[in-house]
Amino acid sequence: MREGGGNMQNWLFTKARHAGLAALTAIVALMVLVPAGAQAATPPGCAALQAKYPDLKGKTLVNAINPHTPGYEAIDPKDPSKYVGFDIDLGEAIGDCLGFKLTYKAVTFAALLTTLASGQADIVISDIYATKERAKAADFITYSKVFDGVLVAKGNPKGIHGIDLTLCGAAAAENTGFVEVPLVQDMGPKCKEAGKPEPTLQLYDNNANCIQAILAGRADTYINDVNTVDQAVKAYPDKLEKAIAVTIPYSVGIAVPKNKPEFRDAVLAALIEVQKAGIHMELLKKWELDVNNFKEPDILTAD
């Protein structure tokens, strides 16, 4: 994270800095923090699920997250020992339904699934797109449609309007491991065929650094979840804008270990109860996320 970044970085980290270097070092080193905020009443169908999956009741599980996506998962600006966001609340609601608590392990986005596979985390609820490629490393319970936004500097000086030929010659900032990376790379041959320069990629570990790349003039665009892009525009209305929203053929999913199908089924069943109770929709509204992202859950595996 670069210094002097402005509103969004200040929103995420000012409180942590004020806590002192030792406290900040502890946050970075331990990376296991507690959630913030209480959940709505547990749905009535959850009692039967706790009876069906008794091994989960009373447990404390670890959720691996990349806490740099305001609205989804971020450090609480009022208390750097806590996390806040839609994914945090959704995970807590699922945990309440099944009788377990969650703690959090913060990692880079690229390390989310490896952290899960190594046993350092039990679950990943961190705005991660479920793809067949990623399903080789984990099973997914999908719960959200995907719409990406194209973030650009105010006035869109490069005239970028999507993952198309307007991207030719542009510098795109992206998160390492994000599905948008190969989409940008795939434009290279198409641009060459059209007699245009290929787009270039700058890879970063989190959303805030990608946004900073545009603010600093190093990058021309950042393509990511439309709600993340909208949050960036809200933070920097005089410096950034959303050029367009594009449909991406993926869903957001909860990742669980491939060798724990019973746990996967339990999470799926709990998510269904949470949705039936209206909690999922309430959380979308609470965090000012697009309710059109809502989808009924499904399972995605590599098979």
Can you name each region flagged by the protein language model?
Residues K145-V152, D230, K234-I272, D290-D303:
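Periplasmic-binding protein-like
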Residues P67-P70, S81-D96, I128, G149-N206, ...:
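Bilobed "Venus flytrap"/periplasmic-binding protein-like clamshell domains
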Residues A41-D127, K286:
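Extracytoplasmic small-molecule ligand-binding "clamshell" domains
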Residues A41-P44, A48-A51, V179-K196, K242, ...:
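Ligand-binding clefts/hinges and TM-proximal coupling segments of bilobed small-molecule sensing domains
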Residues A110-T114, I128-K136, Q185-D186, L215-I248:
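A ligand-binding cleft/hinge motif common to bilobed small-molecule-binding domains
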Residues F86, Y104-T114, K158-G159, E198-Q212, ...:
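Short helix-initiation/N-cap motifs at beta->coil->alpha
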Residues K101-L165:
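Acidic, polar ligand-binding/catalytic clefts
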Residues P43, I88-C97, N156, G169-A171, ...:
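Extended ligand-binding regions for polar small-molecule ligands
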